[in-house]
């Protein structure tokens, strides 16, 4: 067909309808509307009846305008998208006067960072990964665990691990504290969904875009390097990790003990990323076994993800004496099997945080 039309064959990334509004029937109204049941007609009256200028007006004009039955109005009064039926025609986007519903590609979603018009809740604002926490909690509550997991994995590829070791800053900002004296335990829900995924047999590989032909070298196989490899692979690039250690994981493996993060769980999470098509070279260190100049010959980009292995100094006399170890140094030696004979000896642990308690 392309030859007949004089064009070229190429790949255009598909886009499907999506929206950010979660208000629906719960949203506050500024007047009672009794006009034509069309969002565009309502918008002509002072921008609609919502106090929120960015919210879904809820009359379903987008649903009426969809010719592929890809949209329906949900119980909350906001449109629900069926990704399998959406063809990305854009007819819903055209008739939405509030610009709530838009076409987004996989790249759009993976590279998205919050915008000021998106009414981001306090929990998501405090989440370092910017996970859409209300969405995955809602899916989990309805038993739609795979959809819950997909929401998490668009921002965080290591839910098995974070579900066990994340300090959960999101819960500090949970509005339920003001109502029930206790936050929604988002992190436990994340762990539950990830454990459910770990237990099932037929587990799909996350959707990846077609190969771009671009190769990226990642120096370091800790959480930063693994996360970068995951997103690069999903975007169609070919990442390769170079790590100085015999196994991947970085501080997750060599700094967090078994009782908090079982190695079986860690390995499962790492292998989930590797099976997407990520190459690895172990026991090689930058500056000794290879150089940046050598990598530049074979790769289109290089990512430095060596991590933050240096310990904070106590800035006190005697901290460099024999027999004084920094916390992460001690944990790393123990994990690597370095002989540390402390039998019958008294040990002082300075500090009271996670590292001190692990040591």
Where do the language-model regions lie?
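Iron-sulfur cluster-binding cysteine motifs and their immediate structural context
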Residues: 1, 31-40, 44, 50-87, ...
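Short flanking/linker segments adjacent to small metal-binding domains or redox-active Cys/His motifs
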Residues: 6, 13-30, 168-189, 215-226
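Long, charged amphipathic helices and adjacent flexible linkers at domain junctions
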Residues: 8-28, 107-116, 120, 191, ...
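Immediate flanking context of iron-sulfur cluster ligation sites
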Residues: 9-17, 47-50, 113-122, 146-169
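N-terminal Rossmann-like dinucleotide/flavin-binding domain of flavoprotein oxidoreductases
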Residues: 149-156, 167-169, 189, 251-300
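Extreme N-terminal leader/targeting segments of oxidoreductases
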Residues: 160, 176, 180-214, 234, ...
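Rossmann-like dinucleotide/flavin-binding elements
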Residues: 217-242, 281-291, 296, 310-312, ...
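Glycine-rich beta-alpha-beta "Rossmann" dinucleotide-binding loop(s) and their flanking helix/strand
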Residues: 302-304, 310-332
